[in-house]
């Protein structure tokens, strides 16, 4: 069934303290499948990034339901991506008074849902 891009609704979580590479491996698994299936997959995946992704997905579905009046059972994840956010600098003390810089990466998670078109 084709996806209706006119009814696309999105939700964004910004400055999540997680590497975008680690978030993308989970988003690749749920892109293009239904909302209910994605919740089940996220529930049982062993990755830490599933928690913020699940929150963003539920927020996108709530936006579709409350703002556009779309039935959640017809929703499919049309877009899901993670952009790189700013890296937080931290310093690790080293020998002889030196310090190494440590990057603490952040990411912005975007999930868009759209309803299926009836043929």
Swiss-Prot record:
Q: What role is this protein assigned?
A: This protein binds specifically to 23S rRNA; its binding is stimulated by other ribosomal proteins, e.g. L4, L17, and L20. It is important during the early stages of 50S assembly. It makes multiple contacts with different domains of the 23S rRNA in the assembled 50S subunit and ribosome. The globular domain of the protein is located near the polypeptide exit tunnel on the outside of the subunit, while an extended beta-hairpin is found that lines the wall of the exit tunnel in the center of the 70S ribosome.
Q: Note the CDD domains from the entry.
A: Ribosomal_L22
**Pfam short name (any one):** Ribosomal_L22
Coiled-coil stretches are none
Keyword presence, Zinc-finger: no
User: What are the record's GO terms for cellular component?
Assistant: cytosolic large ribosomal subunit
Q: Which SUPFAM superfamilies match?
A: Ribosomal protein L22 (SSF54843)
Tell me which Gene Ontology terms the entry assigns under biological process: translation
Q: What is the lineage of its organism?
A: Bacteria, Bacillati, Cyanobacteriota, Cyanophyceae, Oscillatoriophycideae
- Looking at the keywords, is RNA-binding present? yes
* Domain of life, per lineage: Bacteria
- What is the protein name given in its UniProt record? Large ribosomal subunit protein uL22
Its family remark reads: Belongs to the universal ribosomal protein uL22 family.
One example of the protein's molecular function in GO is: structural constituent of ribosome
* Swiss-Prot/TrEMBL keywords: Ribonucleoprotein, Ribosomal protein, RNA-binding, rRNA-binding
Subunit record text: Part of the 50S ribosomal subunit.
